[in-house]
Amino acid sequence: MGADEYTANAFARTNYVFTPFYIADGLQTALSPLGDIWAYNGVYYYIRLCNTFLEHIGDVYNLRAGELENWSAEIKALKAFYYFELMKRYGPFVLVPKNIDIYAPIEEQRQLRSPMDSCVQAITNLLDEAIPYLTPLREKDASRREFFSKEGAMGLKARVLLYAASPLFNGGISPYKDMKNKSGVDLFSKEDKEKWRIAAEYADEVIDYLEARGYKLISGTNSESTPLLNTMRDLELSLWAPNFQNSTEAIMIVSGASDLYQYVLPRLGTKSTDPHYSGVLYGVLGTNIRMINKFYTANGLPISEDKTWVHGDGYGMAQERDVMYTNVIPLGTDVLALHLDREPRFYATIAAPGLYWQRGSGSSNRLLVDSRRGQLFGLTEDRIDPRIRQNITGYYVKKGTRSDFRTQEYFTEINKFKQGATVYMRLAELYLIAAEAWNEYEGPNGAHRDQIFNRLNAVRERAGLPTVQVSWGEYGINPNKFNEQVGLRDIIHREKTIEFMFEGHRFWDVRRWGTAIAEGWNDKPLAWVVLGETWQEFFNNGQGPVVVWDDAYFNPARDYLFPIKSEEAMISGIVQNPGW
Protein backbone atom coordinates (compact mmCIF):
# COMPACT_ATOMS: atom_id res chain seq x y z
CA MET A 1 0.00 0.00 0.00
CA GLY A 2 2.98 2.27 0.33
CA ALA A 3 3.56 1.94 -3.41
CA ASP A 4 0.98 2.97 -6.01
CA GLU A 5 -1.13 -0.14 -6.49
CA TYR A 6 -3.96 0.58 -4.07
CA THR A 7 -5.85 3.85 -3.80
CA ALA A 8 -8.10 4.71 -0.87
CA ASN A 9 -9.75 7.60 0.91
CA ALA A 10 -8.95 9.21 4.27
CA PHE A 11 -11.24 6.82 6.15
CA ALA A 12 -9.08 3.84 5.20
CA ARG A 13 -5.98 5.64 6.43
CA THR A 14 -7.35 6.72 9.78
CA ASN A 15 -9.63 3.81 10.70
CA TYR A 16 -7.92 0.66 9.40
CA VAL A 17 -4.26 1.23 10.32
CA PHE A 18 -3.20 1.26 6.67
CA THR A 19 -0.18 3.37 7.58
CA PRO A 20 1.79 2.50 4.40
CA PHE A 21 -0.56 4.83 2.51
CA TYR A 22 1.07 7.69 4.41
CA ILE A 23 4.44 6.62 2.98
CA ALA A 24 3.05 7.00 -0.54
CA ASP A 25 1.61 10.37 0.50
CA GLY A 26 5.12 11.55 1.42
CA LEU A 27 4.51 11.64 5.17
CA GLN A 28 7.34 9.38 6.32
CA THR A 29 9.26 10.81 9.28
CA ALA A 30 12.33 9.93 11.33
CA LEU A 31 10.67 10.99 14.58
CA SER A 32 8.08 8.23 14.38
CA PRO A 33 8.81 6.15 11.27
CA LEU A 34 5.96 4.48 9.44
CA GLY A 35 6.48 0.74 9.06
CA ASP A 36 9.32 0.80 11.58
CA ILE A 37 10.72 -2.61 12.52
CA TRP A 38 14.09 -1.47 13.88
CA ALA A 39 13.22 0.02 17.26
CA TYR A 40 12.30 -1.69 20.54
CA ASN A 41 10.00 -4.71 20.14
CA GLY A 42 10.81 -4.74 16.45
CA VAL A 43 12.77 -7.31 14.49
CA TYR A 44 15.79 -7.14 16.78
CA TYR A 45 13.62 -8.45 19.59
CA TYR A 46 12.85 -11.53 17.50
CA ILE A 47 16.47 -11.91 16.42
CA ARG A 48 17.36 -12.00 20.11
CA LEU A 49 14.84 -14.81 20.60
CA CYS A 50 16.39 -16.71 17.67
CA ASN A 51 19.85 -16.33 19.18
CA THR A 52 18.60 -17.48 22.57
CA PHE A 53 17.09 -20.59 21.00
CA LEU A 54 20.26 -21.41 19.07
CA GLU A 55 22.47 -20.87 22.11
CA HIS A 56 20.44 -23.17 24.35
CA ILE A 57 18.78 -25.83 22.15
CA GLY A 58 21.85 -28.02 22.63
CA ASP A 59 21.14 -28.15 26.36
CA VAL A 60 17.90 -30.08 25.84
CA TYR A 61 18.63 -33.70 26.74
CA ASN A 62 15.65 -35.60 25.32
CA LEU A 63 15.56 -34.53 21.68
CA ARG A 64 14.82 -37.25 19.17
CA ALA A 65 17.21 -38.06 16.35
CA GLY A 66 17.41 -35.20 13.86
CA GLU A 67 15.40 -32.70 15.91
CA LEU A 68 18.41 -30.68 17.04
CA GLU A 69 19.61 -30.16 13.47
CA ASN A 70 16.14 -29.61 12.01
CA TRP A 71 14.87 -27.20 14.64
CA SER A 72 18.13 -25.26 14.63
CA ALA A 73 17.90 -25.00 10.84
CA GLU A 74 14.35 -23.67 11.03
CA ILE A 75 15.44 -20.93 13.43
CA LYS A 76 18.53 -20.04 11.38
CA ALA A 77 16.28 -19.59 8.34
CA LEU A 78 13.92 -17.48 10.42
CA LYS A 79 16.80 -15.29 11.60
CA ALA A 80 17.89 -14.88 7.97
CA PHE A 81 14.33 -13.84 7.11
CA TYR A 82 14.39 -11.17 9.84
CA TYR A 83 17.77 -9.91 8.66
CA PHE A 84 16.40 -9.63 5.13
CA GLU A 85 13.42 -7.62 6.35
CA LEU A 86 15.89 -5.16 7.86
CA MET A 87 17.93 -5.07 4.65
CA LYS A 88 14.91 -4.30 2.46
CA ARG A 89 13.94 -1.31 4.59
CA TYR A 90 17.20 0.15 5.87
CA GLY A 91 19.98 -1.21 3.67
CA PRO A 92 23.04 -1.91 5.85
CA PHE A 93 22.00 -2.99 9.34
CA VAL A 94 23.54 -4.09 12.64
CA LEU A 95 24.48 -7.76 12.69
CA VAL A 96 23.87 -9.68 15.91
CA PRO A 97 25.69 -13.03 15.59
CA LYS A 98 25.22 -13.61 19.32
CA ASN A 99 23.21 -11.84 21.98
CA ILE A 100 24.94 -9.08 23.92
CA ASP A 101 24.50 -9.28 27.67
CA ILE A 102 22.07 -6.64 28.87
CA TYR A 103 24.59 -5.67 31.57
CA ALA A 104 27.45 -5.24 29.11
CA PRO A 105 29.18 -1.84 29.01
CA ILE A 106 27.37 0.73 26.90
CA GLU A 107 30.15 0.85 24.31
CA GLU A 108 29.82 -2.89 23.74
CA GLN A 109 26.11 -2.46 23.18
CA ARG A 110 26.66 0.36 20.68
CA GLN A 111 27.23 -1.76 17.59
CA LEU A 112 27.97 -0.27 14.17
CA ARG A 113 25.99 -0.87 11.01
CA SER A 114 27.77 -3.48 8.92
CA PRO A 115 28.63 -2.99 5.23
CA MET A 116 26.00 -4.16 2.77
CA ASP A 117 28.11 -7.05 1.51
CA SER A 118 28.62 -8.30 5.08
CA CYS A 119 24.88 -8.16 5.70
CA VAL A 120 24.14 -10.19 2.59
CA GLN A 121 26.85 -12.69 3.48
CA ALA A 122 25.40 -13.13 6.96
CA ILE A 123 21.95 -13.83 5.52
CA THR A 124 23.16 -16.33 2.94
CA ASN A 125 25.47 -18.04 5.45
CA LEU A 126 22.52 -18.66 7.77
CA LEU A 127 20.50 -20.08 4.89
CA ASP A 128 23.40 -22.22 3.69
CA GLU A 129 23.74 -23.65 7.20
CA ALA A 130 20.00 -24.29 7.40
CA ILE A 131 19.05 -25.69 3.99
CA PRO A 132 20.75 -29.12 4.25
CA TYR A 133 18.85 -29.88 7.47
CA LEU A 134 15.43 -28.52 6.50
CA THR A 135 12.60 -30.86 5.55
CA PRO A 136 10.85 -30.45 2.18
CA LEU A 137 7.37 -29.02 2.66
CA ARG A 138 5.53 -32.10 1.42
CA GLU A 139 7.41 -34.30 3.90
CA LYS A 140 6.81 -32.14 6.96
CA ASP A 141 4.47 -33.28 9.71
CA ALA A 142 1.22 -31.33 9.76
CA SER A 143 2.23 -29.71 13.04
CA ARG A 144 5.50 -28.41 11.50
CA ARG A 145 4.29 -27.03 8.18
CA GLU A 146 4.26 -23.46 9.40
CA PHE A 147 8.01 -23.61 10.05
CA PHE A 148 10.61 -23.07 7.33
CA SER A 149 10.84 -25.79 4.67
CA LYS A 150 13.79 -26.54 2.40
CA GLU A 151 11.97 -24.99 -0.58
CA GLY A 152 11.10 -21.87 1.38
CA ALA A 153 14.68 -21.27 2.50
CA MET A 154 16.03 -21.87 -1.00
CA GLY A 155 13.48 -19.46 -2.45
CA LEU A 156 14.34 -16.86 0.17
CA LYS A 157 18.04 -17.13 -0.66
CA ALA A 158 17.25 -16.64 -4.36
CA ARG A 159 15.31 -13.48 -3.54
CA VAL A 160 18.09 -12.19 -1.26
CA LEU A 161 20.71 -12.68 -3.97
CA LEU A 162 18.53 -10.86 -6.50
CA TYR A 163 18.15 -7.89 -4.16
CA ALA A 164 21.88 -7.93 -3.43
CA ALA A 165 22.61 -7.63 -7.16
CA SER A 166 20.06 -4.85 -7.75
CA PRO A 167 21.12 -1.19 -8.12
CA LEU A 168 19.98 -0.01 -4.68
CA PHE A 169 22.12 -2.59 -2.87
CA ASN A 170 24.84 -3.25 -5.47
CA GLY A 171 27.01 -0.15 -5.29
CA GLY A 172 24.11 1.93 -4.07
CA ILE A 173 22.24 4.63 -5.95
CA SER A 174 22.61 8.31 -5.18
CA PRO A 175 22.69 9.40 -2.34
CA TYR A 176 23.89 6.11 -0.81
CA LYS A 177 27.08 5.56 -2.82
CA ASP A 178 29.33 7.37 -0.33
CA MET A 179 27.56 6.33 2.87
CA LYS A 180 29.90 5.32 5.72
CA ASN A 181 29.36 4.06 9.25
CA LYS A 182 30.65 5.89 12.34
CA SER A 183 34.10 4.31 12.00
CA GLY A 184 34.47 5.55 8.42
CA VAL A 185 33.91 2.19 6.72
CA ASP A 186 32.03 2.30 3.40
CA LEU A 187 28.59 0.75 3.79
CA PHE A 188 28.10 0.21 0.05
CA SER A 189 30.80 -1.36 -2.09
CA LYS A 190 31.34 -0.53 -5.74
CA GLU A 191 28.97 -2.08 -8.25
CA ASP A 192 29.84 -5.71 -8.96
CA LYS A 193 28.27 -7.25 -12.05
CA GLU A 194 29.18 -10.74 -10.84
CA LYS A 195 26.43 -10.50 -8.23
CA TRP A 196 23.92 -10.86 -11.06
CA ARG A 197 25.62 -14.08 -12.18
CA ILE A 198 25.53 -15.47 -8.65
CA ALA A 199 21.82 -14.64 -8.38
CA ALA A 200 21.06 -16.15 -11.79
CA GLU A 201 22.95 -19.39 -11.20
CA TYR A 202 21.35 -19.94 -7.83
CA ALA A 203 17.87 -19.23 -9.20
CA ASP A 204 18.47 -21.85 -11.90
CA GLU A 205 19.64 -24.30 -9.23
CA VAL A 206 16.49 -23.76 -7.17
CA ILE A 207 14.24 -24.08 -10.22
CA ASP A 208 15.89 -27.36 -11.19
CA TYR A 209 15.44 -28.66 -7.64
CA LEU A 210 11.77 -27.67 -7.55
CA GLU A 211 10.85 -28.92 -11.01
CA ALA A 212 12.51 -32.27 -10.34
CA ARG A 213 10.13 -32.63 -7.39
CA GLY A 214 6.96 -31.85 -9.29
CA TYR A 215 6.65 -28.11 -8.80
CA LYS A 216 5.10 -26.29 -11.75
CA LEU A 217 2.95 -23.28 -12.52
CA ILE A 218 -0.72 -23.96 -11.88
CA SER A 219 -2.50 -24.41 -15.20
CA GLY A 220 -4.84 -26.71 -17.04
CA THR A 221 -8.21 -25.78 -15.56
CA ASN A 222 -10.93 -27.06 -17.90
CA SER A 223 -14.05 -26.72 -15.79
CA GLU A 224 -15.07 -23.27 -17.01
CA SER A 225 -17.14 -22.46 -20.07
CA THR A 226 -14.43 -20.67 -22.12
CA PRO A 227 -10.64 -20.82 -22.46
CA LEU A 228 -10.38 -17.29 -21.05
CA LEU A 229 -12.31 -18.24 -17.92
CA ASN A 230 -10.11 -21.33 -17.51
CA THR A 231 -6.99 -19.17 -17.67
CA MET A 232 -8.47 -16.72 -15.18
CA ARG A 233 -9.16 -19.61 -12.82
CA ASP A 234 -5.56 -20.84 -13.15
CA LEU A 235 -4.32 -17.39 -12.21
CA GLU A 236 -6.69 -17.21 -9.26
CA LEU A 237 -5.60 -20.60 -7.92
CA SER A 238 -1.90 -19.72 -8.12
CA LEU A 239 -2.24 -17.78 -4.86
CA TRP A 240 -3.85 -20.50 -2.79
CA ALA A 241 -2.40 -23.32 -0.67
CA PRO A 242 -5.08 -24.06 1.94
CA ASN A 243 -3.72 -25.76 5.03
CA PHE A 244 -0.22 -25.56 3.46
CA GLN A 245 -1.22 -28.10 0.77
CA ASN A 246 -2.65 -28.64 -2.70
CA SER A 247 -0.40 -26.27 -4.62
CA THR A 248 2.24 -27.14 -7.19
CA GLU A 249 3.34 -23.49 -7.34
CA ALA A 250 3.62 -22.26 -3.74
CA ILE A 251 7.21 -22.73 -2.56
CA MET A 252 6.98 -20.70 0.65
CA ILE A 253 3.81 -20.58 2.73
CA VAL A 254 3.55 -18.63 5.96
CA SER A 255 1.27 -19.08 8.91
CA GLY A 256 -1.56 -16.61 9.32
CA ALA A 257 -4.57 -15.72 7.24
CA SER A 258 -4.67 -12.23 5.75
CA ASP A 259 -7.85 -10.25 6.33
CA LEU A 260 -7.14 -7.89 3.44
CA TYR A 261 -10.14 -9.28 1.58
CA GLN A 262 -12.40 -7.48 4.06
CA TYR A 263 -11.15 -4.14 2.78
CA VAL A 264 -10.97 -5.15 -0.89
CA LEU A 265 -14.35 -6.81 -1.40
CA PRO A 266 -17.41 -4.54 -1.60
CA ARG A 267 -20.28 -4.73 0.86
CA LEU A 268 -22.87 -4.88 -1.97
CA GLY A 269 -25.88 -3.26 -0.41
CA THR A 270 -26.86 -1.39 2.71
CA LYS A 271 -28.89 -3.91 4.71
CA SER A 272 -28.97 -7.62 5.46
CA THR A 273 -32.02 -8.22 3.25
CA ASP A 274 -30.11 -7.13 0.13
CA PRO A 275 -29.38 -10.32 -1.88
CA HIS A 276 -25.56 -9.98 -1.96
CA TYR A 277 -24.95 -8.02 1.24
CA SER A 278 -22.14 -8.75 3.71
CA GLY A 279 -21.75 -6.52 6.73
CA VAL A 280 -18.12 -7.56 7.35
CA LEU A 281 -16.84 -6.38 3.95
CA TYR A 282 -15.82 -2.76 3.43
CA GLY A 283 -14.55 -2.32 -0.15
CA VAL A 284 -12.42 0.73 0.66
CA LEU A 285 -9.32 -0.36 -1.29
CA GLY A 286 -9.47 0.29 -5.01
CA THR A 287 -6.86 0.75 -7.69
CA ASN A 288 -6.10 3.42 -10.26
CA ILE A 289 -5.50 4.10 -13.92
CA ARG A 290 -1.72 3.68 -13.65
CA MET A 291 -2.22 0.05 -12.65
CA ILE A 292 -4.93 -0.47 -15.28
CA ASN A 293 -2.50 0.75 -17.93
CA LYS A 294 0.25 -1.57 -16.70
CA PHE A 295 -1.58 -4.63 -18.02
CA TYR A 296 -0.86 -5.80 -21.54
CA THR A 297 -3.19 -5.97 -24.48
CA ALA A 298 -4.47 -9.36 -25.59
CA ASN A 299 -1.36 -9.54 -27.80
CA GLY A 300 0.90 -9.40 -24.73
CA LEU A 301 2.15 -5.84 -25.26
CA PRO A 302 1.82 -2.48 -23.52
CA ILE A 303 -0.98 -0.50 -25.15
CA SER A 304 1.49 2.11 -26.41
CA GLU A 305 3.61 -0.58 -28.11
CA ASP A 306 0.84 -2.62 -29.79
CA LYS A 307 0.48 -1.57 -33.41
CA THR A 308 -2.89 -3.36 -33.64
CA TRP A 309 -4.52 -1.43 -30.75
CA VAL A 310 -7.52 0.41 -32.22
CA HIS A 311 -8.96 2.18 -29.17
CA GLY A 312 -6.69 5.24 -28.99
CA ASP A 313 -6.43 6.50 -25.42
CA GLY A 314 -9.15 4.03 -24.43
CA TYR A 315 -11.36 6.69 -22.87
CA GLY A 316 -14.22 6.32 -25.32
CA MET A 317 -16.91 3.64 -25.36
CA ALA A 318 -16.86 0.53 -27.56
CA GLN A 319 -18.47 -2.90 -27.80
CA GLU A 320 -17.14 -6.43 -27.60
CA ARG A 321 -18.74 -9.11 -29.79
CA ASP A 322 -16.22 -11.96 -29.63
CA VAL A 323 -17.75 -14.90 -27.74
CA MET A 324 -14.38 -15.69 -26.16
CA TYR A 325 -15.22 -12.89 -23.69
CA THR A 326 -18.58 -14.40 -22.71
CA ASN A 327 -19.28 -13.95 -18.98
CA VAL A 328 -16.32 -11.58 -18.70
CA ILE A 329 -17.51 -8.62 -20.78
CA PRO A 330 -21.18 -7.91 -21.62
CA LEU A 331 -21.30 -8.61 -25.35
CA GLY A 332 -22.84 -6.04 -27.66
CA THR A 333 -22.94 -3.43 -24.89
CA ASP A 334 -21.09 -0.13 -24.61
CA VAL A 335 -18.17 -0.45 -22.19
CA LEU A 336 -15.03 1.62 -21.68
CA ALA A 337 -12.65 0.83 -24.55
CA LEU A 338 -9.72 0.73 -22.11
CA HIS A 339 -11.24 -2.46 -20.69
CA LEU A 340 -11.41 -4.26 -24.05
CA ASP A 341 -8.82 -6.45 -25.76
CA ARG A 342 -6.72 -6.82 -22.61
CA GLU A 343 -4.73 -9.79 -21.35
CA PRO A 344 -6.30 -12.46 -19.09
CA ARG A 345 -4.44 -11.19 -16.02
CA PHE A 346 -6.30 -7.91 -16.30
CA TYR A 347 -9.66 -9.67 -16.13
CA ALA A 348 -8.44 -12.04 -13.39
CA THR A 349 -6.99 -9.25 -11.24
CA ILE A 350 -9.24 -6.22 -11.70
CA ALA A 351 -12.98 -5.84 -11.24
CA ALA A 352 -13.45 -3.03 -13.74
CA PRO A 353 -16.56 -0.87 -14.09
CA GLY A 354 -18.87 -2.26 -16.75
CA LEU A 355 -17.47 -5.82 -16.67
CA TYR A 356 -18.62 -8.98 -14.89
CA TRP A 357 -17.31 -10.27 -11.56
CA GLN A 358 -18.07 -13.83 -10.49
CA ARG A 359 -19.00 -13.65 -6.80
CA GLY A 360 -19.99 -17.28 -6.22
CA SER A 361 -20.99 -20.20 -8.42
CA GLY A 362 -23.72 -19.93 -11.04
CA SER A 363 -25.09 -17.15 -13.20
CA SER A 364 -27.03 -15.55 -10.34
CA ASN A 365 -23.70 -14.62 -8.73
CA ARG A 366 -22.17 -13.22 -11.91
CA LEU A 367 -22.48 -9.54 -11.11
CA LEU A 368 -22.03 -6.52 -13.34
CA VAL A 369 -19.58 -4.13 -11.71
CA ASP A 370 -21.73 -1.01 -11.82
CA SER A 371 -19.75 1.58 -9.87
CA ARG A 372 -21.99 4.53 -10.69
CA ARG A 373 -23.47 6.35 -7.74
CA GLY A 374 -26.57 4.60 -6.44
CA GLN A 375 -25.77 1.28 -8.15
CA LEU A 376 -24.71 -2.04 -6.58
CA PHE A 377 -20.96 -1.33 -6.56
CA GLY A 378 -21.27 2.44 -6.31
CA LEU A 379 -21.52 5.05 -3.61
CA THR A 380 -24.80 5.79 -1.90
CA GLU A 381 -23.62 9.22 -0.76
CA ASP A 382 -23.73 12.40 -2.83
CA ARG A 383 -20.19 13.47 -1.94
CA ILE A 384 -16.76 12.10 -1.11
CA ASP A 385 -16.78 11.87 2.67
CA PRO A 386 -13.55 11.17 4.64
CA ARG A 387 -15.59 9.90 7.59
CA ILE A 388 -17.13 6.86 5.91
CA ARG A 389 -16.19 3.78 3.86
CA GLN A 390 -15.99 4.62 0.17
CA ASN A 391 -14.27 3.27 -2.92
CA ILE A 392 -13.03 6.44 -4.62
CA THR A 393 -11.80 4.94 -7.91
CA GLY A 394 -14.62 2.72 -9.22
CA TYR A 395 -12.18 -0.20 -9.58
CA TYR A 396 -12.08 -3.17 -7.21
CA VAL A 397 -9.30 -5.73 -6.79
CA LYS A 398 -9.98 -9.43 -7.39
CA LYS A 399 -6.41 -10.56 -6.67
CA GLY A 400 -6.21 -12.77 -3.62
CA THR A 401 -9.96 -13.40 -3.41
CA ARG A 402 -12.04 -16.44 -4.37
CA SER A 403 -14.60 -16.30 -7.15
CA ASP A 404 -16.37 -19.45 -5.92
CA PHE A 405 -17.47 -18.05 -2.54
CA ARG A 406 -20.65 -15.99 -2.41
CA THR A 407 -20.30 -12.52 -0.97
CA GLN A 408 -22.85 -13.21 1.76
CA GLU A 409 -20.86 -16.17 3.16
CA TYR A 410 -17.37 -15.04 2.18
CA PHE A 411 -16.13 -14.31 5.70
CA THR A 412 -17.15 -17.74 7.00
CA GLU A 413 -16.07 -19.70 3.92
CA ILE A 414 -12.67 -18.11 3.46
CA ASN A 415 -11.64 -18.51 7.08
CA LYS A 416 -12.65 -22.16 6.97
CA PHE A 417 -10.94 -22.73 3.64
CA LYS A 418 -7.52 -21.12 4.17
CA GLN A 419 -6.85 -22.74 7.53
CA GLY A 420 -4.15 -20.27 8.49
CA ALA A 421 -1.94 -20.41 5.39
CA THR A 422 -0.85 -17.57 3.10
CA VAL A 423 1.34 -18.03 0.01
CA TYR A 424 4.49 -15.90 0.40
CA MET A 425 6.49 -17.05 -2.62
CA ARG A 426 5.53 -18.70 -5.91
CA LEU A 427 7.52 -20.59 -8.52
CA ALA A 428 6.71 -17.82 -11.02
CA GLU A 429 8.91 -15.49 -8.98
CA LEU A 430 11.89 -17.83 -9.37
CA TYR A 431 11.39 -17.83 -13.15
CA LEU A 432 11.43 -14.04 -13.25
CA ILE A 433 14.41 -13.84 -10.88
CA ALA A 434 16.41 -16.02 -13.28
CA ALA A 435 15.30 -14.03 -16.33
CA GLU A 436 16.11 -10.68 -14.72
CA ALA A 437 19.48 -11.73 -13.37
CA TRP A 438 20.74 -13.34 -16.58
CA ASN A 439 19.64 -10.34 -18.63
CA GLU A 440 21.44 -7.95 -16.30
CA TYR A 441 24.56 -10.09 -16.37
CA GLU A 442 24.96 -10.67 -20.09
CA GLY A 443 21.94 -9.28 -21.95
CA PRO A 444 19.55 -11.20 -24.21
CA ASN A 445 22.17 -12.41 -26.67
CA GLY A 446 24.56 -14.19 -24.34
CA ALA A 447 25.10 -17.83 -23.50
CA HIS A 448 21.93 -17.97 -21.38
CA ARG A 449 19.51 -16.51 -23.90
CA ASP A 450 17.39 -19.66 -23.85
CA GLN A 451 17.12 -19.59 -20.05
CA ILE A 452 15.95 -15.98 -20.11
CA PHE A 453 13.18 -16.51 -22.62
CA ASN A 454 12.14 -19.95 -21.42
CA ARG A 455 11.62 -18.62 -17.89
CA LEU A 456 9.91 -15.44 -19.03
CA ASN A 457 7.67 -17.18 -21.53
CA ALA A 458 6.61 -19.83 -19.02
CA VAL A 459 4.99 -17.09 -16.93
CA ARG A 460 3.42 -15.46 -19.97
CA GLU A 461 2.10 -18.68 -21.48
CA ARG A 462 0.37 -19.66 -18.23
CA ALA A 463 -1.26 -16.24 -18.36
CA GLY A 464 -2.62 -16.94 -21.84
CA LEU A 465 -0.15 -14.73 -23.73
CA PRO A 466 2.09 -15.29 -26.75
CA THR A 467 5.82 -15.56 -26.18
CA VAL A 468 7.86 -12.38 -25.93
CA GLN A 469 9.29 -13.09 -29.38
CA VAL A 470 5.85 -13.45 -30.96
CA SER A 471 4.28 -10.49 -29.16
CA TRP A 472 6.97 -7.97 -30.04
CA GLY A 473 8.04 -9.58 -33.30
CA GLU A 474 4.56 -9.76 -34.85
CA TYR A 475 2.53 -7.06 -33.09
CA GLY A 476 5.07 -4.65 -31.62
CA ILE A 477 5.94 -1.17 -32.81
CA ASN A 478 9.56 -2.00 -31.96
CA PRO A 479 9.91 -5.64 -33.04
CA ASN A 480 13.56 -5.83 -31.94
CA LYS A 481 13.03 -4.57 -28.38
CA PHE A 482 13.54 -7.95 -26.73
CA ASN A 483 16.95 -8.33 -28.40
CA GLU A 484 18.32 -5.29 -26.56
CA GLN A 485 19.34 -5.42 -22.89
CA VAL A 486 17.58 -2.18 -21.94
CA GLY A 487 14.46 -3.17 -23.85
CA LEU A 488 14.36 -6.63 -22.30
CA ARG A 489 14.91 -5.09 -18.87
CA ASP A 490 11.77 -3.01 -19.39
CA ILE A 491 9.85 -6.12 -20.49
CA ILE A 492 10.99 -8.13 -17.46
CA HIS A 493 10.23 -5.31 -15.01
CA ARG A 494 6.75 -4.94 -16.43
CA GLU A 495 6.16 -8.69 -16.37
CA LYS A 496 7.11 -8.73 -12.69
CA THR A 497 4.77 -5.82 -11.98
CA ILE A 498 1.80 -7.45 -13.69
CA GLU A 499 2.27 -11.01 -12.46
CA PHE A 500 2.76 -9.95 -8.83
CA MET A 501 0.52 -6.91 -8.66
CA PHE A 502 -1.10 -6.61 -5.20
CA GLU A 503 1.17 -9.34 -3.77
CA GLY A 504 3.52 -6.98 -1.92
CA HIS A 505 6.38 -6.90 -4.44
CA ARG A 506 6.10 -3.54 -6.16
CA PHE A 507 6.89 -1.47 -3.05
CA TRP A 508 10.29 -3.19 -2.85
CA ASP A 509 10.96 -3.79 -6.56
CA VAL A 510 10.71 -0.13 -7.54
CA ARG A 511 13.06 0.75 -4.69
CA ARG A 512 15.69 -1.87 -5.54
CA TRP A 513 15.51 -0.83 -9.22
CA GLY A 514 15.76 2.87 -8.31
CA THR A 515 12.92 3.75 -10.70
CA ALA A 516 10.39 5.55 -8.48
CA ILE A 517 10.44 8.83 -10.40
CA ALA A 518 10.18 7.11 -13.79
CA GLU A 519 7.26 5.09 -12.40
CA GLY A 520 5.41 8.30 -11.56
CA TRP A 521 5.46 8.10 -7.78
CA ASN A 522 5.19 11.88 -7.60
CA ASP A 523 2.04 11.85 -9.73
CA LYS A 524 -1.37 11.88 -8.07
CA PRO A 525 -3.52 8.77 -8.63
CA LEU A 526 -6.18 9.00 -11.32
CA ALA A 527 -9.47 7.16 -11.73
CA TRP A 528 -13.11 7.90 -12.51
CA VAL A 529 -15.88 10.21 -11.32
CA VAL A 530 -17.49 7.92 -8.77
CA LEU A 531 -20.25 10.45 -8.09
CA GLY A 532 -21.45 10.14 -11.69
CA GLU A 533 -24.91 8.62 -12.12
CA THR A 534 -24.60 7.83 -15.84
CA TRP A 535 -21.75 6.03 -17.57
CA GLN A 536 -21.02 9.22 -19.48
CA GLU A 537 -20.65 11.17 -16.25
CA PHE A 538 -18.77 8.34 -14.56
CA PHE A 539 -16.18 8.16 -17.34
CA ASN A 540 -15.82 11.95 -17.40
CA ASN A 541 -17.48 12.43 -20.77
CA GLY A 542 -14.57 10.77 -22.55
CA GLN A 543 -12.11 13.39 -21.30
CA GLY A 544 -10.00 10.93 -19.35
CA PRO A 545 -9.55 10.07 -15.68
CA VAL A 546 -9.48 12.60 -12.86
CA VAL A 547 -7.37 13.03 -9.73
CA VAL A 548 -8.97 11.03 -6.90
CA TRP A 549 -6.40 11.60 -4.15
CA ASP A 550 -4.34 14.77 -3.72
CA ASP A 551 -1.18 13.40 -2.13
CA ALA A 552 1.72 11.59 -3.79
CA TYR A 553 5.33 12.38 -3.00
CA PHE A 554 8.64 10.55 -3.32
CA ASN A 555 11.98 12.22 -2.63
CA PRO A 556 14.75 10.23 -4.35
CA ALA A 557 17.33 11.85 -2.07
CA ARG A 558 15.90 10.03 0.95
CA ASP A 559 12.94 7.73 0.28
CA TYR A 560 14.57 4.66 -1.23
CA LEU A 561 15.50 3.58 2.30
CA PHE A 562 13.50 3.95 5.51
CA PRO A 563 14.67 6.25 8.30
CA ILE A 564 15.90 4.75 11.54
CA LYS A 565 13.94 6.28 14.39
CA SER A 566 15.87 9.42 15.35
CA GLU A 567 15.79 8.56 19.05
CA GLU A 568 17.20 5.11 18.27
CA ALA A 569 19.99 6.56 16.12
CA MET A 570 20.91 9.05 18.83
CA ILE A 571 20.98 6.52 21.68
CA SER A 572 22.75 3.73 19.79
CA GLY A 573 25.16 6.00 17.96
CA ILE A 574 24.52 4.41 14.56
CA VAL A 575 24.61 6.50 11.41
CA GLN A 576 21.22 7.63 10.08
CA ASN A 577 20.19 6.99 6.46
CA PRO A 578 20.76 9.99 4.14
CA GLY A 579 18.02 12.59 3.98
CA TRP A 580 16.65 11.88 7.44
Description of each model-found segment:
Residues 85, 89, 163, 170, ...:
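Alpha-helix C-terminal capping/termination sites
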Residues 324-462:
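C-terminal substrate/ligand-recognition segments
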Residues 10-90, 106-150, 315, 335-340, ...:
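Conserved, well-structured interaction surfaces
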Residues 61-72, 194, 442-451:
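Structural helix-adjacent loops and short alpha-helical linkers that scaffold large soluble proteins
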Residues 1-16, 93, 151, 161-381, ...:
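An aromatic- and glycine-enriched ligand-binding surface/loop that stacks and positions planar moieties
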Residues 43-46, 122-124, 162-164, 182, ...:
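Long, intrinsically disordered, low-complexity segments
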